């Protein structure tokens, strides 16, 4: 295991991760070239990174997210997009009258293994909201206008912070 790292690929064809050229960190300042790639299961690989020759150097890369250069990716097909294109889009909801009102802005697209999740920073501040990225929850995406329409599930809409009663932390009789 000297100098090898575990790598999870989120590319459309997981094995193609090494064909996209050097990967970079989030800042774009450090680049990493894959010297070899060995499939473990699904989209998880053991990779040897050029210049990483010791266990300590490999451990220094733990939890580091690596990115493919946008220029290395093929252009999306008609009606397709990259998930990264969603970050920064305004998210709107329809009010009771059908008028679209700003809900927040997409801060990130997450995936913990059960499907893509949109992290939305609310327009009124507060904690971000997580919404499943499904056609039912996100029925309309307009990349040109830089906006999406979201229909939050009832569970999300019902989440209100608990109110503290004026009497403090003691239960009332």
Swiss-Prot record:
Keyword Zinc-finger recorded: no
Q: Could you tell me where this protein is found in the cell?
A: Cytoplasm
Region of interest (Disordered), residue spans: 152-173
Give the originating organism: Beijerinckia indica subsp. indica (strain ATCC 9039 / DSM 1715 / NCIMB 8712)
Gene from which the chain derives = rimM
- Gene3D superfamilies given for it? PRC-barrel domain, RimM
Oligomeric form and interacting partners: Binds ribosomal protein uS19.
The record's PANTHER family line, in alphabetical order, gives: RIBOSOME MATURATION FACTOR RIMM
* One Pfam family, short name: PRC_RimM
| Keyword Chaperone applies | yes
Give the family from UniProt.
Belongs to the RimM family.
Ranges of residues in domain PRC barrel:
78-157
According to its UniProt entry, the protein's GO biological process terms are: ribosomal small subunit biogenesis; rRNA processing
The protein in question is named: Ribosome maturation factor RimM
